[in-house]
Amino acid sequence: MNAHNAALGGTPQRLKRGIPLALRGVARRFGEREVLKDIDLLVPAGQFVAIVGRSGCGKSTLLRLLAGLDQPSRGELLAGSAALAEAREDTRLMFQDSRLLPWKRVIDNVGLGLRGDWRAKALQALRAVGLAERANEWPAALSGGQKQRVALARALIHEPRLLLLDEPLGALDALTRIEMQQLIEGLWREHGFTVLLVTHDVSEAVAVADRVILIEDGEIGLDLPVELPRPRSRGSARLAALEAEVLNRVLAQPELPPQPEPVSPLPTQLRWAL
């Protein structure tokens, strides 16, 4: 079964707004170490893909390449038949750190970098993540989970077609993490954007994604479709079996030293507004 057909079981049955991605021979080298090794990957429009692997395997490096925060040493990154760089305005990125500006109120963080009459749109984005009533508060008054909801609203206001998630839930408690997973999944089903989620949490990957990709020492070691109906029952035997399959592969790999994060080509404020 090809990757496109494998996605159909979980991808929302509606007109896809997401960006289709194609990576062709993508590699990234830091000095003598090749972190990514000729990655070939096709992601259909509107698919939810989770990327897992041990620390240092290259998964966050891959996400930075897709976000345009770094450049490949070789290979092509495509959005459909065009260069992915041409779709930057349709791409948004969330980090583990919410990166809210503490001197700006919640609604102003959501509208960061926008011009014109954006406040109604920002309030709508906050309403979508359940925080409309906190619009005029300061970030310091919010919990960690609420700050990540604001970061998600900041991405949603741009109506992204590609949402890149770099372990955005890693610092949250277990219950808040599940609530955020359900929120992200619900918004994905509603809006149809393409999602790539980097996570250390295998159970999270299997619970929310159409497809789980394991990076092993810079290469795709496993590309596993998750063909389960939504919403998924976290206690199901099938979900547990898929989780065990991926986890056993992850644990069989050694942990590698982390890669240095390259200097972003984007101004700091624009990175935070991603």
Curated annotation (Swiss-Prot):
Listed InterPro entries: AAA+_ATPase, ABC_transporter-like_ATP-bd, ABC_transporter-like_CS, ABC_transporter_ATP-bind, P-loop_NTPase
Any GO CC annotation of this UniProt entry: plasma membrane
Enzyme Commission no: 7.6.2.14
Annotated ATP binding sites: 53-60
Alphabetized UniProt keyword annotations: ATP-binding, Cell inner membrane, Cell membrane, Membrane, Nucleotide-binding, Translocase, Transport
Subcellular location: Cell inner membrane
UniProt key word Hydrolase: no
Main location: membrane
Membrane topology: Peripheral membrane protein
Signal peptide extent: none
A Pfam family per the record: ABC_tran
SMART domains named in the record: AAA (SM00382)
Residue ranges of the TM segments: none
GO MF terms held by the record: ATP binding; ATP hydrolysis activity
CDD domains in the record: ABC_NrtD_SsuB_transporters (cd03293)
PROSITE patterns membership: ABC_TRANSPORTER_1, ABC_TRANSPORTER_2, SSUB
Enzyme class: translocase
Stated family: Belongs to the ABC transporter superfamily. Aliphatic sulfonates importer (TC 3.A.1.17.2) family.
Subunit composition and interactions: The complex is composed of two ATP-binding proteins (SsuB), two transmembrane proteins (SsuC) and a solute-binding protein (SsuA).
Descriptive protein name: Aliphatic sulfonates import ATP-binding protein SsuB 1
Organism annotation: Pseudomonas aeruginosa (strain ATCC 15692 / DSM 22644 / CIP 104116 / JCM 14847 / LMG 12228 / 1C / PRS 101 / PAO1)
Upper taxonomic lineage: Bacteria, Pseudomonadati, Pseudomonadota, Gammaproteobacteria, Pseudomonadales
